[in-house]
Amino acid sequence: MSRRCAVRLPGVAALVAAGVLALCTAGGAQAQAPTQARAQSEPAEERPLGQRHLQGPGQGEPQRPRIGLVLSGGGARGFAHIGVLRVLQELRVPVDLVVGTSMGAVVGGAYAAGRSAAELERFARDTDWAAVLADRPSRAAGEFRRREVDLEVPSRIEFGIGPGLSLNAPPAVAGSHALEAALEELLPQGQAQRPAGRLSLGFRAVATDLRTGELVEMSDEPLAVALRASLSVPGLFPPFARDGRLLVDGGLVRNVPVDLARAMGAQVLIVVNVGTSVDHVRDLASPLGVAQQMINLLTEQNAQRSLGELTSVDLLIQPDLEGLDATELATGAQRAIAAGERAARALSSRLEALAIAPQAWASFEQARVQQPLAPGTADTGKLLVRPTGRASAELLAAAAGTTLGQTVDAATARAAADRLYASGDFERVEVQSALLPDGRALILVPVEAPWRRNPLRLGLELQTEQGTREDATRLGLTATTTLRPLNAWGGELRALMRLGSQSTLMGEWWQPLGPGSRVFGVTSWRRDAEAQDIYFDGQRVTQLRVSEATWRLGAGVSLGRSGDVQMGLERSRSRVSPLLRADLASGPIALTTTQAYAQLRVDTLDSIAFPTRGTFVGALWESGGLSGADRGSATLARVLSGFTWGRWAGHVYAEASHASKGSAPLALGGFLRLSGTPISSLYGQTSLFGRMVMGVPLAHMPLGLGGAVRAGLSVELGGAFLPGQSRRLDDLQKAGSAFVSVDTLFGPAYLALGATHRGSRATYVFLGPFW
């Protein structure tokens, strides 16, 4: 059991990103009985390494002071601890116990478990911190059904729909799963499940009980759990639920836990403080920036009290980290490590006084590094999945791409957990080892996230065009939700509504023919309506209101997580009405058709906002009418492929569409569809189009508010042709654009200038899907 602070401390602090939190803000924790006092009753091989090296006179080993290492929290600034450890190892300074908070707990816990400073540096440098700080699974790893929603609503504004239609918002900017996977990868094999207090070095991680504000010492929990709980920075990572408590960053009550190290028996302390000063935060315009400043105010107060407890024999190391933000995990590691090393070397004369002889150091390091596997650690076992309240073990195993009962190793189980997490329904998916009556098992334990249950996604669309013959503005609000699973086979019900210049109402039921079945049936109803400008020779001649209601019934086969193939029947009713006063006498036209369809869709793009990897392929064939003059068909094909070239990235896109009667399914005109021409102003029986888009990153939006800011350009080529018209390359229109793009929470936003080779120009403000 974790030991809580037994003394309630006065004061209540409001924590913006985590809700109201009563905090311990003065005083200290009740002292635990020194671990050295109870060491005499424990077998030597079970005692922490520091205690085994302090047997006292007459036991064959020299007496030396017991050294405690105290590592503060500080986010990316905490990587400075690695530089300090590098110097301690170089000077042969033995550390008998480690107490850490937040990133200090991560670095200190991994060191106590056997990692070297060099291995910790590789972790800081090579970890995909963008994935760790992401608010959801990577798009490329997710299921095709989830990626399909992005094409209609590329927004990241989502809420979970709970009982009584309540809305649940995410509790933090980043998710949990990737962080926990990174921590397990950091720890030596077999140490993630070892109790934090049973390492060869004495170790404690510090967390805060979010409900009570009490300090929580993590000692009996598995090491990976202790590190994860201590690193739960409010607003950045979700609180960690454990034994009925919600645990967050220990820095809120003890960012420099000097008193805990004393209570564990330390006689000399090496304290490394990397906390952010209260006047350092540069971004107070974002919710996360405000939350970070609130945390800084709280941690700075308790840190100063803790530093006041140091004595003349203790060493305080405070690296110069001016200008380094706590959230710069992806870019600040090398700078922080170097700063920590410089600060430690500045005190090398005092550190050398604590050094031990080379032979004693070799023995000390061997015992620290070569630790036995934690009890219950298994390299292989039977794979099981713990069912949730909404999904069976069979359905979850299918989503994880595995089979219940098969024998797997730990890496295979972790890969299955990653695939299950990528379904988008869970906060995290743990891999637990258990000894069952019929043998060892590796169990996938999905932890449901209320903010991902029945997700409601909200979107905003804006397209303004200035400079063409007919300026235009289009605005839309969208909402879509998916209810899943509807049954034991994993059925889904999806709904979409769009209000604005274009109105859409859609409902779809998608039903696999068994748990994990690749074969499915689908039925949908959709109604679209919008005002369309009709152009002739580049000039608007009239405006029509076009509405279409379509019902589909089909079946298909999933292509793994990449796409699907469908075929079936659809029945459509279209209505066209004039909107201009001069055309009202012509009256509306209605048409009802029944036709067969077949479609192929493949989507492995890494991003909808600005694709740089992966491919999108879409092909559709429709044929209707009974025979002769009534028969008609339409086809379209689209291909997009992302690429990178040094710092530049972008995509190449091509499309073609044709109708045996009437207009081709796709019209041209507008931003990135022959930029500089009016929106949807070019149509014919056949349309051809291609473009290349490239951009270079300039900056990055504040964490939690979006992604990269880029400058870029496009080169475009295309045309629409009537029957009998020439379709040579010289007949295609040439266009291009220069733009600044921002990956916002609502999707890709562009400010652009477009032009054609014929001299027409337009400026665009664009937000939403550009397909």
How should each PLM-predicted stretch be described?
Residues 30-101, 109-418, 422-429, 434-435, ...:
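Patatin-like phospholipase
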Residues 74, 104, 120, 213, ...:
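Buried hydrophobic packing residues in well-ordered domains
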Residues 411, 416, 428-599, 605, ...:
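Gram-negative/organellar outer-membrane beta-barrel architecture
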